[in-house]
Amino acid sequence: ANKPYHGKSKAGYYGDFVIETDAMVGKVMNALNMHGFADNTLVVFTADNGAETHAFERLEEFKQWSSGKYRGVKRDVYEGGHRVPFIVKWPGKIKQGSVSDEVVSQVDFAATFAKIINYPLGKKEAIDSYNLLPVFEGKKYSKPLRVATVQNTSPKKFALRQGDWVLIDLSLIHI
């Protein structure tokens, strides 16, 4: 967290960072409103990975766990390492307060944004990206959007998720 936010949360550096992030997102949202863009702007709030390993110290000291109930940390194949918030606001397109159980990936931004701007993706562009507009619109699929999701954050660690199951290091666990 930057200096003006140090000590604001009484929950250490991470708590201060959360307060600063909230303030900065608020500034962006206020600017969109002030300039008349809020009703025609897609806003995505997400993260790139789960908690860092020093999060265990934070858990002990402040009784907070940013990965919630999920096992694992950044650069890990377990859910806590890569399951992150994915909050999308798009007035008139996405129903406020809606929630989806669909497994999505940030690589899906490419196909989604291409669809929004009517950009025809070539055969070699965004080959593993899916258009999320139906998910945003609250449509339910008869089968999952993607057959499986591969997670790897280091050369020798891979996980393969399909539905509620994850194959990790040749061990199958139910999540």
Regions found by a protein language model. Name each.
Residues 1, 18, 25, 42-47, ...:
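Beta-strand elements within well-structured catalytic alpha/beta cores of enzymes
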Residues 4-13, 30-93:
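Histidine-centered active-site microenvironments of extracellular/periplasmic hydrolases
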Residues 13-19, 103:
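Catalytic nucleophile-loop/oxyanion-hole region of alpha/beta-hydrolase
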Residues 16, 22, 39, 48, ...:
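Acidic side chains
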Residues 23-30:
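Core alpha-helical elements of the protein kinase catalytic domain
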Residues 28, 174-175:
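Aromatic/hydrophobic pocket-lining residues that form π-stacking "cages" and hydrophobic walls in ligand
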Residues 51-77, 93-98, 102, 107-173:
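C-terminal cap/loop subdomain of S1 sulfatases and analogous C-terminal strand-loop tails that border
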